[in-house]
Design a protein with these regions (language model features):
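A generic structural motif
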Residues: 84-89, 127-135
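Short, aliphatic-rich beta-strand segments
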Residues: 121-125
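Long, contiguous binding/interaction regions
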Residues: 115, 127, 133, 140-152, ...
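Short, internal acidic amphipathic alpha-helical interface segments
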Residues: 83-120
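Short, highly charged C-terminal tails/helix-capping segments
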Residues: 159-183
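Ser/Thr-rich, low-complexity intrinsically disordered terminal regions
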Residues: 37, 41-65, 69-80, 85
Length: 183
């Protein structure tokens, strides 16, 4: 009767390609390993600070951005912090924080803050990977490029309110016009 079957009898594929695929899917891919591969591919300067943390320097149009990504297994979150130096005079802090509020209202993912003690403008974002999800290289690459693009977009607005005599609303109009002008 076996000869009458239109196809050979099924056999377990556990030892073949299926086992390899299952092994790959079950394997823990560390998000920082993915980031390191991206940094190497893009030829960015980077330093693997720890098993769960990496720091990079990424060139933008306006300046070089320091980007740090850290993985928290406990929180199941890949946290990205993109920073650049900014030393506003004390009397400009109010208008800077007003600009931060205006800008953050425009940001759909991530948010800016200013770290006064370190004199750093910070754009941060947390990628939640709960339930054992694994971040893809595309997700992480997009996370980094979005951080740089967002920082580049609003950099002129920060400069106008901190070092010029522009209001937060005026500076935002310049940032919006700049974005549309390049589109």
């Amino acid at each position: 009767m076996v000869g009458l079957l239109p196809y050979p009898p099924t056999r377990s594929v556990r030892g073949g390609a299926m086992a390899l695929i299952e092994s790959f899917l079950e394997e823990d891919i560390h998000p920082i390993d993915i980031v390191e591969n991206i940094a190497e591919h893009k030829a960015w300067d980077f330093d693997r600070i720890a098993e769960d943390q990496i720091a990079m320097a990424v060139e933008g149009r306006w300046r070089t951005y320091s980007i740090t990504l850290a993985w928290s297994a406990y929180d199941e979150t890949l946290r990205m912090v993109c920073t650049f130096e900014m030393e506003p005079p004390a009397h400009k802090h109010g208008v800077l924080f007003e600009a931060l509020n205006e800008i953050n209202d425009q940001c759909w993912a991530g948010a800016f803050t200013y770290w006064t003690e370190q004199s750093l403008m910070v754009y941060r974002y947390g990628l939640l990977l709960s339930g054992g999800q694994v971040a893809s290289a595309d997700q992480i690459s997009t996370l980094i490029s979005s951080a740089v693009a967002t920082s580049e977009r609003y950099y002129p607005a920060f400069q106008l309110v901190v070092y010029g005599d522009h209001s937060a609303k005026d500076a935002m109009q310049v940032a919006i016009a700049e974005a549309y002008g390049r589109a």
